[in-house]
Amino acid sequence: MVQFYSPKKRPAKKQVKNLAVTANALDANGQGIAHAEGKTIFVKGLLPQETARIRLTEEKRQFAKGEVITRLTTNPERVTPPCQYYQHCGGCQQQHVPIDWQRTTKAEVLSHLIKRETNVVISAQPVIAGAEYGYRRRARLGLRYHPKKGLVMGFRQALSNDLVMVTQCPVLKPQLNVLLLPLWQCLKQLSVVRDLGHVELVLADNGPLVILRHLSPLSEGDKQLLDDFSHHAQVMIYLAGDNGEIAQLTTIEKEPFYQIEGLKLHFAPTDFIQVNDEINHKMVAQAIAWLDLSPNDRVLDLFCGMGNFTLPMAKRVDKVVGVEGVPALVAMAKKNAELNQLDNVQFWHADLSADFSAMPWAQEGFNKVLLDPARAGAAQVMSHIVTLSAEKIVYVSCNPTTLARDSKILLDSGYQLTQLRMLDMFPQTGHLESMALFIRK
């Protein structure tokens, strides 16, 4: 029997939908919020009271995302972005949005989330804010060699792994911004230019440092080029090879540090420090004020890092215990306590996502608590915090979703959320950081 094959008809290619919308609000990422065809539509780059013809880039049952084809009307408050790479580089999302709009929107989003998850109505204002540009004291730039373009040094494009070559960045501290072009000119001369991974720039209080990740050994000529650059630009240079170790290249023997609350905190080149030093100062001061520290207090600082909160608190109380999961940060915290002649503080290494109940510090009593967890939050330590029955708890958060989740545990255990603040740690971006004060009823 002869069988005939009839190919199935290919489904018609789904047409991209274009429509005209008017935004009436902003989300935390600076996207305009519009409504059409029974859906909420998030439109990149559209401000409230602006109308545009848009193209839908993603469509779900209850919402859609769109991009502007043509803006038909312009809000007079629209800001001209100062960065030539804006909308190509993925680092910033809100340079077209007035800074007060950015802050108000983020604060409202935070308050709305807390209300939705906990039923607590509370304002996240006044916002803890600082400079809108020139604030970033740490940045990592990718390095990639192209046969035609040569060395590209820059940040990732939005929704892409491609790099956008940058020779200036207005959110960087000026002392770092001026290094971009001469640093690139130096790196592109290296013999291992095809085997570079990334470069980090950090501004310590005693000068800038550069950490270069290289995938092949540097020649003596390469090291000389870098050493010449370090002396000309007055920067400390560190090399990160395949062995995972960080080695200081330059003869400028200075250990990086920053100062806070009259203390000098040293850190290793790859140690975590808050990117925005102005907001960090204000955040630490706010936490100390909220805890209302006195000489008789015993304070527990969880996820303490190298002592950013711990050591300033130790100046004011009877005893502070800091607990951290990264051994290198614990070692640096102990060193900083000794250098600052603080003998009423102890630091412990512990995995705070595991059972730590048998550790000596977990047997102690504390009347005040501060915690500053990573994005995953502090779910595993909340039950221990509750058993302490501390008078006051300050929770510093880089993820409002996990803050809301962990807040419910405290609220259900007899605590009251009395203060909430949005920390504008990363202006021009969608990042939202916050801090909250809980008081035992």
Swiss-Prot record:
Record-given protein name: 23S rRNA (uracil(1939)-C(5))-methyltransferase RlmD
PROSITE patterns documented for this protein: SAM_MT_RNA_M5U (PS51687), TRAM (PS50926), TRMA_1 (PS01230), TRMA_2 (PS01231)
A Gene Ontology biological process term: rRNA base methylation
Record NCBIfam families: PRK13168.1, rumA
Organism listed in the record: Proteus mirabilis (strain HI4320)
Active site (catalytic residues): C398
Annotated EC: 2.1.1.190
Keyword tags: 4Fe-4S, Iron, Iron-sulfur, Metal-binding, Methyltransferase, rRNA processing, S-adenosyl-L-methionine, Transferase
Keyword Iron-sulfur: yes
Domain (TRAM) ranges: 8-70
Listed InterPro entries: 23S_rRNA_MeTrfase_RlmD (IPR001566), MeTrfase_TrmA_AS (IPR030390), MeTrfase_TrmA_CS (IPR030391), NA-bd_OB-fold (IPR012340), SAM-dependent_MTases_sf (IPR029063), TRAM_dom (IPR002792), U5_MeTrfase_fam (IPR010280)
Stated role: Catalyzes the formation of 5-methyl-uridine at position 1939 (m5U1939) in 23S rRNA.
Known catalytic reactions: uridine(1939) in 23S rRNA + S-adenosyl-L-methionine = 5-methyluridine(1939) in 23S rRNA + S-adenosyl-L-homocysteine + H(+)
Domain of life: Bacteria
GO molecular function: 4 iron, 4 sulfur cluster binding; iron ion binding; RNA binding; rRNA (uridine-C5-)-methyltransferase activity
Residues binding [4Fe-4S] cluster, per UniProt: C83, C89, C92, C169
